[in-house]
Design a protein with these regions (language model features):
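N-terminal glycine-rich anion-binding loop in soluble enzyme alpha/beta folds
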Residues: 1-51, 114-156
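Short hydrophobic/aromatic-enriched beta-strand-loop microsegments
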Residues: 87-95, 109-114, 199-208
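N-terminal active-site wall of soluble small-molecule enzyme domains
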Residues: 50-59, 74-81, 85
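Short, well-structured alpha-helical segments in soluble
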Residues: 49-64, 163-176
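Short, flexible loop segments at boundaries between secondary-structure elements
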Residues: 201-222
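Gly/Ser/Thr-rich loops at beta-strand to alpha-helix junctions
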Residues: 12, 69-79, 94-97, 115-119, ...
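Short Gly/Thr/Asp-enriched flexible loops that form oxyanion-binding sites at enzyme active sites
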Residues: 76-88, 190-198
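Charge-patterned, long linear interaction tracts outside catalytic cores
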Residues: 160-194
Length: 222
């Protein structure tokens, strides 16, 4: 059976079905490798050049999957650094899909929904995609889901989190929006709720994994 390895931040908040860190999300085996000291506060930063790469390189060396990914979209810049060290397919972030999607959608037609819109910027986007920096929208700073993730809380109200994501989605889209990318790997569980607001093309870490390792993701989460 195929295996997906996830280099996961050192967090304890709930990872529900649809999250890249939950075994129920996949049809294949899931291997979780915790990256020591890689907290949300350290990784969610405006300046990814300040990231300490060594813990991620160590975690990568332990991975045994047919595909290796991470649990945070802010790690997008690691694609160019870690991929050459990887013998299998490596996906640092859902944002890696933007390079291809930028040939299909304009910044006006594609929105990026992130955990923290104040910190995600051009430095996290693929080369040639800086124009999409204006398409970035985030969770409300006072939202329940953001509080759970930021403070690494042990409990999550899924209904409140769903409302938070739908609220961010509504602010991120207009009548011209044709697609969205969910940067944050904790957002895919709420795709059914998003689609009840508006039927739209949704790209996230799971669609990236599935396109590179077919039949790995449980179809209900695509």
């Amino acid at each position: 059976m195929a295996r997906v390895s996830v280099l996961q931040l050192e967090t304890h908040f709930p990872r529900i079905a649809g999250d890249v860190g939950c075994a129920k999300t996949f049809q294949c085996e899931l291997e979780i490798i915790i990256v020591p000291n890689a907290t949300v506060a350290k990784v969610v930063t405006k300046d990814p050049s300040q990231l300490d790469l060594r813990p991620f390189q160590d975690a990568l060396s332990k991975a045994t999957g047919d595909l290796i990914t991470t649990s945070c979209g802010f790690l997008a810049p690691l694609q160019s650094v870690l991929k050459p060290q990887c013998k299998v397919k490596f996906i640092a972030s859902a944002l890696g899909q933007l390079k291809t999607l930028s040939t299909l959608f304009s910044p006006e037609e594609l929105s990026i929904i992130t955990f923290d819109a104040d910190k995600l910027g051009a430095a996290h986007l693929p080369a040639g995609c800086a124009a999409f920096e204006l398409s970035i929208f985030g969770l409300d700073v006072r939202s329940h889901l953001r509080e759970v993730i930021s403070n690494d809380l042990p409990t999550l109200d899924e209904n409140m989190a769903s409302d938070d994501v739908c609220s961010a989605f509504e602010k991120a889209t207009t009548s011209k929006t044709k697609a969205v990318i969910l940067e944050c790997t904790n957002l895919p569980p709420y795709k059914p709720s998003i689609r009840r607001v508006k039927e739209i093309a949704i790209y996230d870490i799971l669609t990236a994994i599935e396109s590179n390792l077919p039949n790995s993701v449980n179809p209900q989460f695509l």
